[in-house]
Amino acid sequence: MDDPKKIIVALDYDHIDSALTLADNLNPDLCRLKVGKELFTKYGPEIVIQIQKKGFEIFLDLKFHDIPTTVYKACISALSLNVWMLNIHLTGGLNMTQAAMRAKLDCESSTKLIGVTVLTSLSDQDCHNIYGCPRENELLRLKDIAIQADIDGFVCSPYDINILKDSTKIYVTPGVRFGDDKQDHHKAASPKEALDLGSNYLVIGRSITGNSKPNEKLEEIISSL
């Protein structure tokens, strides 16, 4: 797939005014925006609606992880907002993942449903401590869940794409940095590196949101690809 809008700008703010101000300074023809738990917990659907009114497609990053019935109902509610993309935690298991996909089918939704694999904040030692196995083993287990449930793709480190590779899936990579600090992502990469490794969509936050001219920075990143 070759979607020209490869960049998803992460709205990592604690106030709606900051998020809307950034949206006013970005071109919706060049990117999509990610609304995460911080903004959504505080403002609910209103933040999604306000940003959509500005012409942006939304990746609703809530990482649902609960019993199948609860996740099904949560997905139904989220899909009613007509978001472009929605995610769940694949560690919730096959039944939960199938429930999320069933919600999408029942809504006849075109929203992309993707699964979070191993968080980019986790080191290899963290993976051993949490999963009791190497990172690669856990990734393969989660890949199997995603394929069985037939979801649309993965949230993963660009360095994990080779392990998760499947021609029918899309790959969304957080922790992408353009010449700045990696923050708490152990598996960060530059935008060009992430695309070369097989990513379809790049989640970029501070590199753009922390710039005084965010749209110029966005255009610079796009040119670098």
Predicted regions mapped to residue ranges:
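Conserved anion-binding
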Residues: 3-5, 66, 70-161, 167-168, ...
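Conserved, mostly hydrophobic/aromatic
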Residues: 9, 33, 63, 86, ...
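Generic hydrophobic/aromatic pocket-lining and core-packing "Φ" positions
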Residues: 23, 48, 75, 97, ...
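Generic structural signal for hydrophobic
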Residues: 25-26, 51, 78, 146, ...
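Structural motif
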Residues: 28, 54, 81, 149, ...
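Metabolite-binding pocket within alpha/beta catalytic cores that recognizes anionic/polar moieties
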Residues: 31-85
